[in-house]
Amino acid sequence: MQPRTNYLLGVDFGSDSVRCLVVDAADGSELASAVVAYPRWAERLYCDPAHNRYRQHPLDYVESLEASVRQALAACGRDVADAVCGISFDTTASTPALTDAKGTPLALLPEFAEEPDAMFVLWKDHTALAEADEINDLARKWETDYTRYSGGTYSCEWVWAKMLHCLRRSPGLRAAAYSWVEHCDWISALLVGDTTPETIARSRCVAGHKAMWHASWGGLPAPEFLEAVDPLLGIFRGHLYSDTVTGDACVGRLCGEWAARLGLKPGIAVGVGAIDCHVGAVGAGIVPGTLVKVMGTSTCDIVVGTYDEVGDRTVRGICGQVDGSVLPGYIGFEAGQAAFGDLYAWFRRVMAWPLRQIAGSDPQLEERILGELTAEAERLPLTPDDPVALDWHNGRRTPDADPRVRGALDGLTLATSAPAIYKALVEATVFGSRAIDERMLEEGVPIDNILAIGGIARKSPFVMQTMADVIGVPIRVVASDQACALGAAMFAAVAAGLYGSVQEAQRAMCPGFSDEYLPDMERHAVYDRLYDRYLKLGGRR
């Protein structure tokens, strides 16, 4: 009799769509996947980009989850579906929503179905600037510094600021709201059939990095601190949590309703949801001393360190350090850039404007712009006098968060070409990446090697070679387009009891590497001088 083959589902909720990946638990091989776009988001409903408002309806998540799982399983057949033994997730973060006492996001109630402030507030929403300032001002005066493990600054992208902003805009929401839930916690709660705010499992990853949760002060900030920000937040504190769980935990079993909706057997293990970049780092094979760069529209940089290495030290100016947020038993560090690929897309739109407005060009012509710019930029000579840009078009996430700073270009002449400007923008994003690496090293976080995942890492040799030359170390690209979903499947494998630890699952299931970029040290010497100009342009020298 052949031994039973076990399969796992890793579900990756991105900014625009959800991806379901079917994985063989024995070796991580990918059987099938399906990607389903969020239908309302695709129509740009409930968003106001001019005011940095980005909202997603909870039905987008529910409908797309159901469709993606069913499509992926249909590509495998019934035998595979019946042999799935675990499912886990990653989502963007902080992407929270206000809920009622049952844990239902308020946008699922008829009276708030079209109210953007009742929906999930997407990670890149920057409407809560004033509320973040209030939290930071109070934290600097409070006896306990609740931002200590958040890099010293609480961001407008994080849950307390976002929920406070929504509560203050609508008296109706303020009266109806009982608690809040992060996207990743809501999905796992849905699947086990219990969304009660006081009892659902809460992810250590998102709680520690986005909600100022830390064991040293008993979990979330004290009720008195939250009440001083707004009395309702203090009340919410009693409807939330003190304990959290790491990504390897099983939060429960798939309930009958959701088993039927997804086409799975009831009772399979449901894992803990966590932040996409952290889960992607697991899928990449992160170990202590490895920096994983998750490279897409923005970036996220993930490192893990041992307790002996880190001790009581805190790293200033990053997005947090949390015990067990990536690998259980290790400190997880998060940093990142607010715009990376988005910066290249912005310049493409600038270049395409006359084509659209005057020539009425074919959209396929616009798609060629970055490819042509890249080809020409690769041929340009590299000199210390080249134009230099700042990559802060969407503010600065790290080092030292400041959403109000803006991008810049320096050193332009009448001879500066479009490819030269594009080259400067690529270099600026990579200089921003180097600044993060240097901050980690300055603060005593060991980094021995760099791995890269994400669309840019897989698709842009120009950007990756520039990064290797600027940073001056080799960079290996992980051989999977779906590292986040694969990392979620690894967590599902541990939750289902197939492996005794995340590291054991990684050893069996990690995909290896597809490319390695080695630095050109002659170019690195020139980039050192350009990097110094970048730092001076941003007032950081």
Can you say where each PLM-predicted feature lies in the sequence?
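N-terminal glycine/serine-rich phosphate-binding loop of ATP-dependent small-molecule kinases
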Residues: 1-108, 235, 260, 264-269, ...
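Gly/Ser/Thr-rich active-site cleft segment
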Residues: 13-15, 139-272, 390-394, 422, ...
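Phosphate/ATP-binding catalytic cores across multiple sugar-kinase/actin-like superfamilies
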Residues: 65-75, 257, 285, 421-448, ...
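Active-site phosphate-binding/coordination module
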Residues: 78-158
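Glycine-rich phosphate-binding/hydrolytic loop that grips phosphoryl groups
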Residues: 130-133, 279-283, 338-341, 345-348, ...
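Acidic, glycine/GT-rich loop-and beta-edge segments that sit at the periphery of enzyme/chaperone cores
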Residues: 157, 335, 343-345, 350-359, ...
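ATP-dependent carbohydrate kinase catalytic cores
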Residues: 158, 212-328, 355-356, 361-375, ...
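Activation-segment/catalytic-loop signature of the eukaryotic protein kinase fold
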Residues: 379-479
